[in-house]
């Protein structure tokens, strides 16, 4: 089953997450099919902390991918931010 979830990167005490489409049997930070965005929870003020390719998320969900709860929350937040800016 395909799932879109967070893959952790960064260093100790400085997390950085990639939003990836991957098989649910793969490890959290393991092999993935496509990187669809990133999330930086400790980004400095004025820098971009979240970017998601919403068209690619829609493509993967249309092909049966599930969103993890954290990714679902981030997608809602980002789509509201994008629609407010437009």
Swiss-Prot record:
The keyword Ribonucleoprotein applies. Keywords: Ribonucleoprotein, Ribosomal protein. It holds the Pfam family Ribosomal_S16. Disulfide bonds: none annotated. InterPro entries: Ribosomal_bS16 (IPR000307), Ribosomal_bS16_dom_sf (IPR023803). GO terms for biological process: translation. SUPFAM superfamilies: Ribosomal protein S16. Gene3D superfamilies: 3.30.1320.10. GO terms for cellular component: cytoplasm; small ribosomal subunit. One of its GO terms (molecular function) is structural constituent of ribosome. Signal peptide: none annotated. Belongs to the bacterial ribosomal protein bS16 family. PANTHER family: 30S RIBOSOMAL PROTEIN S16 (PTHR12919), SMALL RIBOSOMAL SUBUNIT PROTEIN BS16M (PTHR12919:SF20). This is Small ribosomal subunit protein bS16. It comes from Bordetella pertussis (strain Tohama I / ATCC BAA-589 / NCTC 13251).
